Structures are given as C-alpha cells and as structure tokens.
C-alpha cells in the first residue's frame, strides 16, 4: 500500500482538537496521504462536490455502515491486492452518501456496524491505513 496513492474525501470539518491531533499523528506516518474536506451541505450537494473531487482513474471505496465489515489483516490484504491503483476513500456527512455514490463505489466498506461521527470515522480510517501498511511491512505495530 502506497499512501501517496491514497486520498480521503470526507464531508465536514474536524471540530474536536483531540481527533485532529490523532489524524495528524497518523498523517505524518503516512507521507503523501491526501485528505480533501468536502463542505457540509445537503446530501445531493455533498455528492456533487465528491463527484467533482474524484479522479477518473481512482478505485472508489465508500465508507458506510452497511458495507463489508473486514478485520485489519483482510483489509491490509485487500489494499495490497489493489497494487498501485489510486484509491479514494469517501466518508459521507451526517446523512451518509447518496445511493448514486454508493453505487459508484468499487468497494463499500464498514468500519463497524455502529454509527460514528464522520470526524471520528476519519480518524479510525487513517489509523487502519497506517495499521495496514504496518501489517504489509511486518512492523510490530500490529500485534493481533
């Protein structure tokens, strides 16, 4: 997994400083990872902004409650199988993603069957990206 080939498109700003601190901690460990903030709006307007931000050659991974629930090791393996493809992880706002965006995704992924604030989902995703990289590199960070 190459962080410089990954982008996170997330609706909304991170308002809690402790979440922002966590995001920055892992972002420093994943050089090249890009985070695009999409302005909060109606689901249709958010979808328009997300579509406009997606690149034609990106493998779109939509985060949603009803997506595939996978453990950290299968997640790392899946990212490894994607090789050098450019990845766009999409995190919706309070109302989630539109059906059109869900359908456009190459993979629908769930971090948990529970619902989390989008800013916390962003932190959880970036930690899992770092963990996936550690798993693939054989780093002791992942001890499960």
Curated annotation (Swiss-Prot):
UniProt name for this protein: Ribosomal RNA large subunit methyltransferase H
Q: What InterPro entries does the annotation carry?
A: Alpha/beta_knot_MTases, RlmH-like, tRNA_m1G_MTases_N
Query: Gene3D superfamilies from the xrefs?
Result: 3.40.1280.10
The reaction(s) annotated as catalysed by this protein in its Swiss-Prot or TrEMBL entry are:
pseudouridine(1915) in 23S rRNA + S-adenosyl-L-methionine = N(3)-methylpseudouridine(1915) in 23S rRNA + S-adenosyl-L-homocysteine + H(+)
What is the protein's quaternary organization?
A: Homodimer.
Q: Which SUPFAM superfamilies match?
A: alpha/beta knot
Q: Please give the PANTHER family that the UniProt record associates with this protein.
A: METHYLTRANSFERASE, RIBOSOMAL RNA LARGE SUBUNIT METHYLTRANSFERASE H
**TM spans (from-to):** none
Q: Where does this protein chiefly localize?
A: cytoplasm
Q: Where in the sequence is the signal peptide annotated?
A: none
EC number(s) per entry: 2.1.1.177
Identify the GO cellular component terms for this protein: cytoplasm
Q: Name one Pfam family in it.
A: SPOUT_MTase
Q: Which purpose does this protein serve, as stated in its record? A: Specifically methylates the pseudouridine at position 1915 (m3Psi1915) in 23S rRNA.
Q: Which organism is it from?
A: Parasynechococcus marenigrum (strain WH8102)
The UniProt annotation places S-adenosyl-L-methionine binding at: 63, 92, 111-116
Q: What family classification does the UniProt entry report for this protein?
A: Belongs to the RNA methyltransferase RlmH family.
Localisation: Cytoplasm
| Keywords of this entry | Cytoplasm, Methyltransferase, rRNA processing, S-adenosyl-L-methionine, Transferase
Q: Which GO terms describe its molecular function?
A: rRNA (pseudouridine-N3-)-methyltransferase activity
């Amino acid at each position: 997994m190459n962080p410089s080939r990954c982008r996170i498109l997330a609706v909304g700003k991170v308002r809690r400083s402790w979440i922002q601190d966590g995001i920055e901690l892992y972002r420093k460990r994943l050089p090249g990872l890009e985070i695009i903030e999409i302005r909060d709006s109606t689901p249709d307007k958010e979808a328009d902004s997300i579509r406009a931000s997606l690149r034609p050659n990106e493998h779109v991974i939509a985060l949603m409650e009803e997506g595939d629930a996978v453990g950290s090791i299968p997640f790392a393996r899946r990212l490894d199988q994607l090789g050098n493809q450019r990845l766009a992880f999409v995190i919706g706002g309070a109302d989630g993603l539109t059906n059109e965006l869900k359908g456009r995704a190459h993979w629908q992924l769930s971090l948990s069957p529970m619902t989390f604030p989008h800013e916390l989902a962003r932190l959880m995703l970036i930690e899992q990206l770092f963990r996936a990289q550690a798993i693939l590199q054989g780093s002791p960070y992942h001890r499960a």
